Amino acid sequence: MPTISQLIGSERKRLTRKTKSPALKSCPERRGVCTRVYTSTPKKPNSALRKVARVRLTSGFEVTAYIPGIGHNLQEHSVVLLRGGRVKDLPGVRYHIIRGTLDTAGVKDRRQSRSKYGAKAPKD
């Protein structure tokens, strides 16, 4: 605990928080181009083939992003929109691709949580 004299000499240092999504550069979303689309296996207790893409962003970063939902139409050179949000069981994946924008199609036949997957309202 500093004394009053010490505080007069120099003020308290502000704590700087480290961002969890540095590639977005304080923007809510970023556009990018897929350089590689592939599957990755999750960490120890889980087992799956998670769909991920390597994306070169307009901010100059190249990051790994998760493709949510069942089925996708992404391939190399697809233009995508990225948001923050990590995938807990995939190390190094700190971004999500937004479905239903730019070259990314929405999830087909999605009935619930449609807005999160870019799915249109069902016809019936």
From Swiss-Prot:
Keywords per UniProt: Methylation, Ribonucleoprotein, Ribosomal protein, RNA-binding, rRNA-binding, tRNA-binding
3-methylthioaspartic acid found at: D89
Disulfide bonds: none
Source organism, top-level taxon: Bacteria
Example GO biological process: translation
CDD domains xref list: Ribosomal_S12 (cd03368)
Record family assignment: Belongs to the universal ribosomal protein uS12 family.
Protein name from the UniProt record: Small ribosomal subunit protein uS12
Protein source organism: Prochlorococcus marinus (strain MIT 9312)
Lineage: Bacteria, Bacillati, Cyanobacteriota, Cyanophyceae, Synechococcales
